[in-house]
């Protein structure tokens, strides 16, 4: 451990070592001085106005995280506050990294039209812990490396392959609800806590096939420490700066423990899949053996698809169930639509794959009103960009998702839940007016299966239950979990078995 620590400290860039100097001046409370020191240490060039050559407005640096923690744990309220104070384009600090925030579709289009050439922040501007967890996964690597790592994963998540998966997904969903409510009786659930593993196991089936009970139990046991690691990463502090990773209280020991257990699980699942011929883990392992990607890239991309997305998919499922439970008129129309397309298993499977249904529109509208993150993940262009009258000098850029999805004149009566607005609408009209899977050519690998999974979960619930939101204040009464980095809703929904004639 000591030799590892000394070796890493020797290799640290000067920015990490000098960052400690900010502690002293931070204690003195001189915010302008701290911000100027941060600019000097990082050597970053600030964005400037074309006309006045003035700096882009933005928030001052605050040690140790800048606004990097607040943008996750309090991002929804912070985004509105910052936009009101600084305008539609401004800058924040994520640790010692400057991030330019865009808030209008025009600015987003100007920046993201060549996103496949952009460079992602390998640590998500969150520090060493995030980098060690996911710094080599397909969602974070860039350019040539991104193309290389993505290639082995493209087939399992392609549109044609995704259309073959509903049968397996339906089986997973039915198994899940059979365990959740075996006697099909009236049940009250917390939408986030009780449903979070349903989409998780559906995605896991893509990689590992039909799970054994032991595999399901092991995956569940790996979840809590992995969630804790993500909370540590986004909380920052000593888990942000590499020089502090060996100090008492860092998450290094928990990280090493998780990584060892995760690698052991994946290798055991690979050996089982060789025997069963089930799952895509075998061809992915073969890609590692051929040198097409490293073992670290494989393990971290699997982690990204499962554990990093555990709360992401839980957020999406939870809000979809909350919305359909609250809007009883829409719920009844969707149920009628489901029943009309449930004459056979094949008809049902085809239905959940269609994009022109009221069910599909409900999923889209929920995603619009409840984006999973307050801000998109940071990425930088290879060349200077002119956006909104400012020169952005190869600096990381993020998007205020609430500003795009809701506070956007493109959406009429934008705060209302109106799934019908999406029926007959072309994807091109949403391209820069709705943040969901990313902007431009480079988008989320799992976007082809995500909607199918959400639709199936809603269908399986609505086929069996009447859903009702147990909040006197309706949607506005749903509170967010305070320790959740993604803002999981604490929605309470009552599942009442349908009568036979319904």
From Swiss-Prot:
Enzyme Commission number(s): 1.-.-.-
Binding site for heme: 444
Subcellular location: Membrane
Induction note: Expression is regulated by the cluster-specific regulator verZ.
Top-level EC class: oxidoreductase
Membrane-crossing segments per the record: 9-29
Cofactor: heme
Glycosylation sites: 124, 190, 271, 342
InterPro entries the record matches: CYP11_CYP27_families, Cyt_P450, Cyt_P450_CS, Cyt_P450_E_grp-I, Cyt_P450_sf
One annotated Gene Ontology cellular component of this protein: membrane
Biological pathway: Mycotoxin biosynthesis
Molecular function via GO: heme binding; iron ion binding; monooxygenase activity; oxidoreductase activity, acting on paired donors, with incorporation or reduction of molecular oxygen
This protein's UniProt keywords: Glycoprotein, Heme, Iron, Membrane, Metal-binding, Monooxygenase, Oxidoreductase, Transmembrane, Transmembrane helix
UniProt topology in membrane: Single-pass membrane protein
Location (main, coarse): membrane
PANTHER family named in the record: CYTOCHROME P450
Known role: Cytochrome P450 monooxygenase; part of the gene cluster that mediates the biosynthesis of 11'-deoxyverticillin A, one of the dimeric epipolythiodioxopiperazines (ETPs) from the verticillin family that act as mycotoxins. 11'-deoxyverticillin A is required for normal conidiation. The nonribosomal peptide synthetase verP is speculated to be responsible for condensation of amino acids to form the carbon skeleton of verticillin, whereas the cluster-specific tailoring enzymes are involved in further modifications leading to the production of 11'-deoxyverticillin A.
Family: Belongs to the cytochrome P450 family.
Protein name as annotated: Cytochrome P450 monooxygenase verC
Lineage of the species this protein comes from: Eukaryota, Fungi, Dikarya, Ascomycota, Pezizomycotina
Gene: verC
């Amino acid at each position: 451990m000591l030799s590892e620590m000394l070796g890493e400290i020797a290799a640290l860039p000067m920015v990490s070592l000098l960052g400690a100097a900010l502690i002293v001046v931070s204690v003195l409370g001189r915010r302008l001085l701290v911000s100027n020191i941060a600019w000097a240490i990082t050597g970053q060039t600030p964005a400037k106005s074309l006309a006045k050559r003035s700096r882009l407005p933005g928030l001052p640096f605050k040690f140790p995280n800048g606004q990097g923690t607040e943008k996750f744990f309090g991002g929804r309220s912070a985004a509105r506050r910052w936009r009101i104070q600084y305008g539609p384009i401004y800058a924040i600090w994520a640790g010692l990294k400057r991030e330019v925030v865009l808030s209008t579709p025009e600015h987003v289009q100007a920046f993201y039209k060549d996103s496949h050439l952009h460079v992602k922040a390998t640590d998500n501007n969150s520090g060493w812990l995030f980098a060690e967890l996911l710094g080599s996964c397909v969602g974070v690597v860039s350019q040539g490396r991104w193309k290389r790592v993505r290639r082995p994963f493209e087939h399992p998540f392609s549109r044609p392959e995704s259309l073959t998966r509903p049968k397996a997904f339906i089986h997973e969903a039915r198994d899940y609800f059979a365990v959740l409510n075996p006697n099909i009786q009236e049940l009250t659930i917390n939408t986030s806590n009780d449903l979070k593993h349903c989409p998780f196991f559906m995605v896991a089936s893509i990689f590992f096939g039909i799970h054994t009970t032991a595999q399901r139990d092991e995956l569940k046991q790996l979840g809590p420490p992995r969630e804790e690691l993500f909370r540590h990463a986004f909380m920052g502090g000593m888990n942000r700066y590499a020089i502090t990773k060996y100090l008492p209280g860092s998450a290094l020991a928990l990280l090493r423990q998780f990584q060892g257990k995760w690698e052991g699980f994946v290798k055991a699942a690979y050996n089982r899949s060789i025997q069963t011929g089930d799952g895509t883990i075998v061809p992915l392992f073969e890609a590692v053996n051929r040198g097409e990607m490293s073992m670290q890239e494989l393990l971290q991309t699997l982690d990204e698809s499962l554990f990093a997305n555990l709360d992401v998919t839980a957020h999406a499922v939870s809000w979809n169930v909350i919305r359909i439970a609250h809007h009883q008129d829409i719920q009844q129309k969707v149920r009628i639509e489901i029943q009309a397309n449930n004459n056979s298993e094949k008809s049902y499977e085809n239905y959940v794959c269609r994009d022109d249904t009221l069910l599909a529109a409900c999923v889209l509208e929920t995603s619009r009103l409840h984006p999973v993150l307050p801000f998109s993940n940071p990425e930088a262009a290879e060349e200077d960009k002119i956006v909104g009258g400012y020169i952005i000098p190869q600096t990381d850029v993020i998007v205020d998702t609430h500003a795009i999805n809701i506070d956007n004149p493109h959406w009429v009566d934008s705060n209302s839940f109106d799934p019908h607005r999406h029926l007959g609408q072309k994807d091109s009209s949403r391209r820069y007016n709705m943040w969901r899977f990313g902007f431009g050519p480079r988008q989320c690998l799992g976007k082809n299966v995500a909607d199918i999974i959400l639709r199936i979960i809603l269908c399986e619930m609505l086929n069996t239950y009447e859903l009702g939101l147990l909040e006197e204040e309706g949607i506005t009464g749903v509170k967010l979990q305070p320790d959740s980095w993604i803002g999981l809703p604490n929605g309470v929904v009552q599942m009442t078995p349908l009568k036979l004639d319904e």
